[in-house]
Structures are given as C-alpha cells and as structure tokens.
UniProtKB/Swiss-Prot annotation:
Official protein name in the record: NADH-quinone oxidoreductase subunit H
Transmembrane segments: 11-31, 50-69, 81-101, 114-134, 154-174, 186-206, 237-257, 265-285, 304-324
Known EC number: 7.1.1.-
Any single biological process term in GO: aerobic respiration
Similarity comment: Belongs to the complex I subunit 1 family.
First and last residue of the signal peptide: none
The UniProt record lists the keyword DNA-binding: no
Phylogenetic classification of the source organism: Bacteria, Pseudomonadati, Pseudomonadota, Gammaproteobacteria, Enterobacterales
EC class (word): translocase
Species this chain originates from: Edwardsiella ictaluri (strain 93-146)
Gene Ontology CC annotations of this record: plasma membrane
Length: 325
C-alpha cells in the first residue's frame, strides 16, 4: 500500500501553499519598514535610508543583522516566562490572521467557513500579548501602555466586527472565498461605503498605528508596553506591527474591493497592487495626521463609529429584506 495517496498530496499542497503565503507576508512586513522610512522621507522632503547598498536597498539586511546580534537582555525585575511569551503570541496571532485571506483563486492559508470570525479571534488574542508584555515588564510606562492598548483594541474591535456584518449579510457567508466571489459584478465599497469607513478606522486603531498609537506615545509613555524589550523579542513586536498593516490592507481589498478581481492582469497581481495601495495609505496617514488625546480617541469610537456601524447594518438588513420580498 502506497504511503502517497491523493489525499496526502492534497494535504501537502495545502500546507505548502499556507507556508509560502505566510513567508511572503513576513517578507512584506519586513520590507514595509524600509518602504515606510523611504516614503516618510519623500513626504517630508528629506532623504530616507540611503547609505547601505544602492539607494539604501540593503538597509533592511543591515537592520536584520543588527537585530540578530543585539543583546537579548531580560531585566531582572520582570516575570521571565510571560515576558518571553508576549512577543511570540503577538507575532503568531497577527501572522495567523492572514491565513484566511485568499490572494488568488485556490490560494489561501486556510479555507475556513468562519474566516471572518477566525480573524476577529486572532485580533482579540493579540490583546493578551500586549497585556502580558506590559504587566510582566514591571514598569509603570509599560503597564500604562498595555492598559491603553487593551482598552483601545477591545473597544475598536467592536466596531471592526460590526462593520463586517453588512458584508457578511450581503454575501450570506463568513467564508472569505464566497465574499470575494459575491463581488464579481459589484464591489462592496459601493453598497457598504460606511462599513468600509468604520473598518479602515478600526483597523488603524487595532494596529496601534498613528494617529491611534496612544499605547506607544513616545512623548507620554516612552514607547509604551515594549519599552523593556530588546533584540529579537523587540523585533517580533516590530515586524508584527507591520504584518498587522499588511493583513488589514489585504482584508480591505478582499472584503470591499473585489479581492483578486480585475481585468487583463493575473489575479495575484491585482491583489498585490490593491493591497500595496492601502499599505501606502497607512504610511500617508502617519505622515499627515496629528495624534489626538487618548480620551478623544475613545470618545470618537463610541460616539461616531458605533452609531455609524449600527446605521449601516440596519440599512443593509432593510435592503436585503426588501429584495427578498
């Protein structure tokens, strides 16, 4: 009896696809750190990284070498086990969030019927990493940053989930592949424009990106919950943040802009172009908007985003019921 059966081959191909996709995501997250610095330099009329390699092309390699050889110091006053687990949980949860995103027909890490719920679960799991990092560091700035991050993330995850319910109701499924197929003739950005607005705002807040980077506010908290981290532990937090940006950008494309659908070019190329556009938008927002106060961030979520998502969901339900009659 042969060990290699059609089922075994299918499982191996699925695992291989998942590994390739996740490796590409990690690479994109790493390269985004270099791209962000170059674009910020362009936006601010100055040079970005330009010393290592031609035009700064090897800056990422230099940063990786520096990160690998930095001392991985654990302060003696920390809870060593939790302190070490926190960056691993943060990195893995953000990376696994991308597994449900279809980058082309048949190309996704995990074809789950509850794809959107899986993403929300992974986003919620990242909150534990932040809390673990802040509490185990035994530092007042870390703890304050972790408390801010957990309150902000849990609040905006409510709007993140509600903004997706209109898309789910229209497609009739939580499966990402089904949602993409439902946009063959009309992208969800048109009927779900308010859902898109609240999703992109909540996505920025969940990623702790400027202007919602209150947990890491340098002027107030001296870099927040990862102030005590160094070496590869800090590197996992750092790359994880950019992986979060890649994931949110890919989800925006998948849920509201037709995923891989587009004329002439191959599906994967269309998906990459659309995702890159929103990644640049994240950087542009960082370069152009000021940071509001923490109470203003929370008030904006509960007073503006929550009513907007509920109105969008109510209107979507009314339209679906009208067409069903």
């Amino acid at each position: 009896m042969s060990v290699i059966t059609p089922d075994t081959v299918e499982i191996l191909l699925t695992v291989l696809k998942a590994v390739v996709i996740l490796l590409v995501v990690v690479t994109c997250g790493a390269f985004m750190s270099f791209g962000e610095r170059r674009l910020l330099g362009l936006f601010q009329n100055r040079y970005g990284p330009s010393r290592v390699g031609w035009g700064g092309s090897l800056q990422l390699v230099a940063d990786m070498i520096k990160m690998f050889f930095k001392e991985d110091w654990v302060p003696p006053f920390t809870d060593r086990l939790i302190f070490t687990l926190a960056p691993m949980i943060a990195f893995c949860s953000l990376l696994l969030s991308f597994a449900i995103v279809p980058v082309a027909p048949g190309w996704m890490g995990a074809d789950l019927n509850i794809g959107i719920l899986f993403f929300l679960m992974m986003a919620g799991l990242a909150v534990y990493a932040v809390l673990f990092a802040g509490w185990s560091s035994n530092n007042k700035y870390s703890l304050l940053g972790a408390m801010r991050a957990s309150a902000q993330t849990l609040s905006y995850e409510v709007f993140l989930g509600l903004s997706l319910m209109g898309v789910v109701a229209q497609a009739g499924s939580f499966n990402m592949q089904v949602i993409v197929d439902s946009q063959t003739h009309l992208w969800n950005i048109i009927p779900q424009f308010f859902g898109f607005l609240t999703f992109i705002i909540a996505g920025v807040a969940v990623c702790h990106r400027h202007p919602f980077d209150q947990p890491e506010a340098e002027q107030e908290l001296a870099d927040g919950y990862h102030i005590e981290y160094s070496g590869m532990k800090f590197g996992l937090f750092f790359v994880g943040e950019y992986i979060g940006i890649v994931t949110i950008s890919a989800l925006i494309v998948t849920l509201f802009f037709g995923g891989w659908h587009g004329p002439w070019l191959p599906p994967f190329i269309w998906f990459a172009i659309k995702t890159a556009f929103f990644m640049v938008m994240f950087i542009l927002v960082r370069a152009s908007l000021p940071r509001p106060r923490y109470d203003q961030v929370m008030a904006f979520g509960w007073r503006i985003c929550l009513p907007l998502t509920l109105i969008n969901l109510l209107v979507t339900a009314a339209v679906i019921l009208y067409h069903a009659q």
